[in-house]
């Protein structure tokens, strides 16, 4: 499960971090979070769909940047004006096309270059591992802020920037 490159991996981790922040901001302590891999019920597609929605919300909220997102009910909303007989077939074909565009092309969670279904599933394994690393931790209101600092220090210091001669300056 090789990652395409270290800079890409770092950017994907930042995208996941944005998702985690949005999810924590929107949820109270007793709510079920969306930033998690639900073993037994989730697919790579359902996980990535939730992450895409959270990322869109985060980019709009924190960066004031609009992100294109295709919701699951996009096809139904698009073709409501068609007759029932033709609409079912049209929705099926449109859904399949959108699914391919949405999941089998590079995106904000592509740790690997994704341009087909096989690569999507390879990337999905990596994405699940990354989500599972973070899902049990709380970023907002956490007394363990040092853990987050240590994590980013390790990411920056031990791989992502050393190849370019750039180093992270540790906190005293």
Regions of interest found by a model, annotated:
Residues 3, 151, 162-164:
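Generic hydrophobic/packing signal
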Residues 7-25:
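Core catalytic lobe of class I
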Residues 2-13, 140-144:
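Structural motif
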């Amino acid at each position: 499960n090789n990652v395409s490159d270290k800079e890409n991996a770092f950017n994907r981790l930042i995208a996941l971090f944005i998702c985690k922040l949005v999810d924590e901001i929107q949820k109270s302590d007793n709510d079920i979070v969306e930033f998690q891999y639900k073993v037994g019920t989730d697919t790579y597609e359902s996980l990535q769909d939730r992450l895409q929605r959270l990322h869109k919300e985060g980019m709009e909220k924190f960066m004031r940047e609009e992100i294109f997102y295709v919701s699951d009910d996009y096809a139904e909303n698009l073709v409501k004006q068609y007759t029932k007989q033709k609409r079912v077939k049209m929705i099926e074909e449109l859904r399949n096309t959108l699914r391919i565009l949405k999941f089998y092309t590079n995106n904000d969670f592509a740790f690997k270059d994704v341009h087909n279904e096989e690569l999507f599933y390879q990337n999905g394994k990596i994405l699940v591992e990354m989500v599972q690393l973070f899902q049990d931790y709380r970023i907002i209101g956490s007394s363990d802020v040092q853990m987050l600092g240590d994590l980013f220090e390790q990411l920056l210091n031990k791989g992502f920037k050393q190849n370019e001669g750039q180093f992270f300056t540790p906190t005293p």
